Every structure is written in C-alpha cells, then in structure tokens.
C-alpha cells in the first residue's frame, strides 16, 4: 500500500492487514475512486493517523493547538482551540471530487454525550458541518448549503455520521450506513476555506474522533459499504 511508504514508523503486521482489508473493501465497493481523502486516526502513531490514505502528502491533517492523540483510539479536541486542519480548500483544490452538487463528508465520533460544537466543519456561506449529537438530542449534517441541516433524533453521538449531497436540491444524513434524514434545501457554492475536524470557524469540539473523510457524493449502497468497511477496521484495531 502506497501509504505505508509515507509512514515514519511502520505499523504492526496486524494493523497492516487491517489497512489492506479496509482499502480493498472500499475499492471493491466503488467508494475509493470517489474520495478526496480518508483518515484512519485510530492507529498506532499520530503521524500515521494524520495521513490522507487516498493520496499521502496531499491533504494530510495538521494538528493545530495540540489536539490529544491516543494510540488506537484517535484524536480528541479540547473545546476551545484544538482541531485538525485537512488542508483541503474546495475552491483552490486541483480537480476535487467534492464539488457543489456532488459532495459528501463523514466522521466517526466516539463521543456519546451532547455538545453544540461540530465534529466536522466549514463555517460561512456554503456550510459543510456535522454534529453527532447536539444538546437538543439531534444529530445534524449539511453539505454546501446555508440552509437548515438534515437532522434526526440522537441520544448517542457515537458512530459514523455521514452528510451527503448528490443533487442541487436535497441533502441526506446517514448514521452507521443507514439514511436517517433528508433536507430539501438548495446548495450554495463551497466557500474558500479549509474543511476541518473538531471545529468550524468559531466553534471547537471536545469530542474524540476515530476516522473521517470527504469526497464526491456516495450512493445509499456506498454509505452502507463505507460503514461496513470502517466498522470492520475499528473492530480489528480494538482487538489488537
């Protein structure tokens, strides 16, 4: 796997096998080709956790203001300044899959409790934001819109939350591979600002996140297959 050459410390044999199985599953499901970035943060070293596995060296994460890394768990924000910058700006990126009416973003949160700060964000006109569980016991996600987010009831913020836009008029929210809500609001052009985990422009999350990524829109079957692949990776890492 190309990403292994970009890792300063090679993963254990067990983790290498899990990487290969996960990425092979995403390729076979037709998901890999649609991604701009995939980050598996619940691994053995912080440097490997920040790699964009789709294209190492491009859109690798920058840990800003010292989010806390825990091996085989992920990265935790502090609720005030710490976050992970994807270094991906949808306006200045070269040939991105993530575009106005064909885009998705996802994050695997390990935080059960509620907070009104998003686990993934890009604030301003053209918002792309994901909340695993707000204090209203709802989860929300929106992609390239300033309008109301797609939402659903949520009393547990843990799991894979995935916001998707395949057309100009509708966005959809998925939890653990299943559709949980749609929202019929028109898209806005993405803004010239980096996507980030654990923050928007002014709000910072204290959650722990294990995985994340973004790219073009995914089908419902893709969403289910993404969850299956990432869940298998997480289960495998938990057992190492």
Where are these regions (language model features)?
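Polar, enzyme-active/binding microenvironments
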Residues: 1-240
